[in-house]
Amino acid sequence: MELIKGNIASPKGFYADGKHAGLKRKRNDIGWIYSEVPANSAAVYTMNQMQAAPIFVTKDSFKNSAKLQAIIVNSGNANAVTGNQGMLDALSMRAKTAEKLAIPMDTVAVASTGIIGEMLPMDKIMTGIDLLEKQTGNAADFEEAILTTDTFQKQISFQTEIGGKTVTMSGVAKGSGMIHPNMATMLAFITTDAAIPAELLQKLLKIKVDKTFNQITVDGDTSTNDMVVVMANGCAENPLIQEGTADFEKFAAMFQAVTEHLAKSIARDGEGATKLIEVQVKGATKTEDARMIAKKIVSSSLVKTAAFGGDGNWGRIICAIGYSGGRFAPDNITIKIGGIEILNHSSQTIFNQQALDAYLEEEHIVIEVDLHIGLESGTAWGCDLSYEYVKINACYRT
């Protein structure tokens, strides 16, 4: 597997574009991804019960077959909690995109992100779709078009050889605030020219989302609009990937690399964030317990503020473990911060405070927890909680 300098349109047969339609003041705010042939596809969605209209429309596109040829996305307006009119507007976005690209409506996915509760300015949306270019667009413009409070574009591309063919996979994501996925707003789109059955793609997507996107948190809020969509158009002409083969393992490893990079990029770009926090839990009896405990630690406001202030207060970590709901033995917990052991079998150790203080000034903080009761492990990612987070969200609409 090789990291390459690419974009969401790097896999063969894919194109992308983005334009400024006027939903936001300056940046691009509408874009699409297009495959020149129908692609086997898979998707996962937010667990928030107040799901936005685009979620329902995308689910409808998957109803008859798991094939997509385009994804249309707008930012600046979530089209969430907008009633029947919001549903009609999302359907209109799908229909307009299908018409412009001359493809069936049920091969178009729709995604939106932005302010909740306001109606889409459909005149601007329709004009924006008309501006999008089918095969001569700029993928970087698409990457900008999906952003809201993000401070940087999030994308990654890899290549590997499968069955004697070069297979490319690219991913792009947005997310900065309202991030606590079970599947938060977090949008991610993955393209690949691999040939793989849709059913296997869906199974693999669910596994990788559980290990990566569902293990990040910024502020504990789960969005109405979360969506991850992957399209595999087969243009690499590799032999069809089958589960349990060496080719599948190669593809799965590349999939893991893409989703983990995007997840960590979202966590690193948390609103107002100055540090990425990574929590690694091992020694659990179940993977689910390890993941649950890791995520509870990284979700703790007290842990997040301690990270911002450079305070190695392990009491906040042990407290989060205690209410996590995961199984552990209270007398058997070991904690390290930046490799510095500060707790051994639930007793504080003698450690170098100056070294710990210096480490906590770094931009990537790793907390290791060993439960000493099993062999399973799990990782979660988040960010610190700063003054700037409050400022951004207090003034979001203005």
From Swiss-Prot:
Biological process, per Gene Ontology: L-arginine biosynthetic process; ornithine biosynthetic process
Site label Cleavage, positions: A184, T185
One MF annotation (Gene Ontology) recorded for this entry: L-glutamate N-acetyltransferase activity
Protein's pathway: Amino-acid biosynthesis; L-arginine biosynthesis; L-ornithine and N-acetyl-L-glutamate from L-glutamate and N(2)-acetyl-L-ornithine (cyclic): step 1/1; Amino-acid biosynthesis; L-arginine biosynthesis; N(2)-acetyl-L-ornithine from L-glutamate: step 1/4
GO CC annotation, single: cytoplasm
Enzyme active site: T185 (nucleophile)
Annotated keywords: Acyltransferase, Amino-acid biosynthesis, Arginine biosynthesis, Autocatalytic cleavage, Cytoplasm, Multifunctional enzyme, Transferase
Binding site for substrate: T148, K174, T185, E271, N393, T398
EC number in record: 2.3.1.35, 2.3.1.1
Family annotation (Pfam families): ArgJ
Taxonomic superkingdom: Bacteria
Presence of keyword Iron-sulfur: no
Site (Involved in the stabilization of negative charge on the oxyanion by the formation of the oxyanion hole): T113, G114
Catalytic activity, as annotated: N(2)-acetyl-L-ornithine + L-glutamate = N-acetyl-L-glutamate + L-ornithine; L-glutamate + acetyl-CoA = N-acetyl-L-glutamate + CoA + H(+)
UniProt-annotated location(s): Cytoplasm
HAMAP family xref list: ArgJ
Family under the similarity heading: Belongs to the ArgJ family.
Subunit structure: Heterotetramer of two alpha and two beta chains.
General function of this protein: Catalyzes two activities which are involved in the cyclic version of arginine biosynthesis: the synthesis of N-acetylglutamate from glutamate and acetyl-CoA as the acetyl donor, and of ornithine by transacetylation between N(2)-acetylornithine and glutamate.
Protein known as: Arginine biosynthesis bifunctional protein ArgJ
Naturally occurring in which organism (per UniProt): Listeria innocua serovar 6a (strain ATCC BAA-680 / CLIP 11262)
